[in-house]
């Protein structure tokens, strides 16, 4: 397996774990592993998307989280109901999370997702 791919996946998992801990802390969840698996499952589907879609895909969520749009989940269904559940939890967490901190996580995840896609040919 390509070393660059392995490093990207390790970083990706680390950031997801950080984000999961933040969500658990703010939302009040007592099982980080539970949240980690859900968030990981959602994000693992992102690399199958064209790279040009990843930025807009995450930015839509970020914009809705930051504006606290209560009707967001009724009006937007991103192809899989699992996404709605996770983003709802991230939205709940964002209520008490400083916007600059949330922004930092998003930037990290966006960068890592793009890196993940670039390395995708080396998975096998």
Curated annotation (Swiss-Prot):
Specify the superkingdom: Viruses
Designated name of the protein: Uncharacterized protein H124R
Q: Which UniProt keywords apply?
A: Late protein, Virion
Q: Which family does it belong to?
A: Belongs to the asfivirus H124R family.
Query: Which lineage do the record's taxonomy fields give for this organism?
Result: Viruses, Varidnaviria, Bamfordvirae, Nucleocytoviricota, Pokkesviricetes
List where in the cell it is found.
Virion
Tell what triggers its expression: Expressed in the late phase of the viral replicative cycle.
Q: Which GO terms describe its cellular component?
A: virion component
